[in-house]
């Protein structure tokens, strides 16, 4: 077992989150509660892992001009800060959460990364690889980093026998898949984009995941919202279905799932227990505003309500 893990956030963001009754596109929407906090997929994963008890080192690229909220968060969590500071300001992303639970994301492109910044990051990655086995690479890419370069880092870590959990989308996901990360966690929408067809049922998702398995990725985890989580490992399929949850916000639920999967593997949980734990953690996340562990007692109760079942391979799987 290990408690040490590195989370990599290449394109972090300050999330400006606001709650609205209903988003009026092309008109005025009045925001009720609002918050501005340090985020980015890898940062969110780090927060949950830290609260679970992991010894987390965070790295990636941070703009010098507005790093204060990140520094405060890292200090509060007690994580090791190995972010590369670069010129400019980290982007601000806007998330509007409607009363129905629907979330509209307005994501900006991110800061410009130079070749010198990249060299500093690569040196940090090499150093961290000396005494860490688990790496979570999550989120989008900033300007200046190509999907192929990102995939090269995955391949490099893999060649050193490191376990890379990779959670991204679009071109970064496509390139990263070819580097054979140890675990990937696309949601059903990202899986649909990858295979180029609509996925409306559990069987559809299972068939697409089976096609993805041909890329020889050891762990393929598909998050499907209220339908739960599907995991393909060593030709075995498991499906975890949570009870119906009162959705407050889906922001960070996928990142929480990644953190749960990572922690479960680090703690060498048995497969069904691991999937039950990670699914419960993610299901609990949608009942709260903000990313974090929430109520431990509620988590334990929810784990007992998660149904985990084996799935049979689909035709062609």
From Swiss-Prot:
SUPFAM superfamilies: Ribokinase-like. The keyword Glycoprotein does not apply. Keywords: ATP-binding, Kinase, Nucleotide-binding, Transferase. ATP binds at residues 223-228, 254-255. The keyword Transferase applies. The active site is at 255 (proton acceptor). It is an enzyme of class 2 (transferase). Gene3D superfamilies: 3.40.1190.20. Disruption phenotype: Does not affect growth on glucose. Mutant shows a severe growth defect on fructose. It catalyses: beta-D-fructose 1-phosphate + ATP = beta-D-fructose 1,6-bisphosphate + ADP + H(+). Its EC number is 2.7.1.56. Induction: Part of the fruBKA (fru) operon, which is induced in the presence of fructose via the FruR (Cra) regulatory protein. Transcription is repressed by FruR in the absence of fructose. CRP activates expression of the fru operon in the absence of glucose. The two regulators can work independently to control the expression of the operon depending on carbon source availability. GO terms for molecular function: 1-phosphofructokinase activity; ATP binding; phosphofructokinase activity. InterPro entries: 1-PFruKinase (IPR022463), Carboh/pur_kinase_PfkB_CS (IPR002173), PfkB_dom (IPR011611), Ribokinase-like (IPR029056), Tagatose/fructose_Pkinase (IPR017583). GO terms for cellular component: cytosol. Catalyzes the ATP-dependent phosphorylation of fructose-l-phosphate to fructose-l,6-bisphosphate. Belongs to the carbohydrate kinase PfkB family. PANTHER family: 1-PHOSPHOFRUCTOKINASE, 1-PHOSPHOFRUCTOKINASE-RELATED. This is 1-phosphofructokinase.
């Amino acid at each position: 077992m290990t408690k040490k893990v590195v989370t990599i956030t290449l394109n972090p963001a300050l999330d400006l989150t606001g709650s609205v009754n209903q988003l009026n596109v092309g008109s005025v929407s009045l925001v009720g509660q609002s918050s501005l906090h340090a985020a980015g997929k890898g940062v969110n994963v780090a927060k949950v892992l830290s609260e679970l008890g992991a010894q987390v080192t965070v790295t990636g690229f941070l703009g010098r001009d507005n790093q204060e909220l990140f520094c405060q968060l890292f200090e509060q969590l007690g994580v090791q800060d190995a972010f590369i500071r670069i010129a400019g300001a980290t982007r601000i992303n806007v998330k509007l959460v409607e009363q129905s639970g629907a979330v509209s994301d307005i994501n900006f492109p991110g800061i410009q990364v130079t070749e010198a910044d990249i060299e500093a990051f690569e040196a940090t990655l090499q150093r961290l690889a000396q005494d860490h086995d688990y790496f979570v690479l999550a989120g989008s890419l900033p300007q200046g980093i190509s999907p192929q370069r990102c995939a090269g880092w995955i391949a490099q870590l893999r060649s050193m026998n490191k376990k890379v959990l990779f959670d991204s989308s679009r071109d970064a996901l496509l390139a990263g898949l070819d580097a054979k990360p140890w675990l990937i966690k696309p949601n059903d929408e990202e899986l649909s984009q990858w295979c180029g067809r609509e996925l409306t049922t559990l069987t559809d998702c299972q068939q697409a995941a089976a096609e993805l398995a041909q890329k020889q990725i050891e762990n393929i985890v598909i998050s499907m919202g209220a339908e739960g989580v599907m995991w393909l490992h060593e030709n075995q399929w498991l499906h975890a279905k949570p009870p119906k949850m009162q959705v407050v916000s889906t922001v960070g639920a996928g990142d929480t799932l990644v953190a749960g999967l990572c922690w479960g593997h680090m703690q060498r949980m048995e497969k069904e227990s691991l999937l039950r734990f990670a699914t419960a953690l993610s299901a609990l996340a949608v009942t709260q505003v903000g990313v974090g562990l929430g109520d431990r007692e509620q988590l334990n109760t929810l784990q007992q309500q998660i149904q985990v079942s084996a799935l049979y391979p689909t035709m062609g799987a």
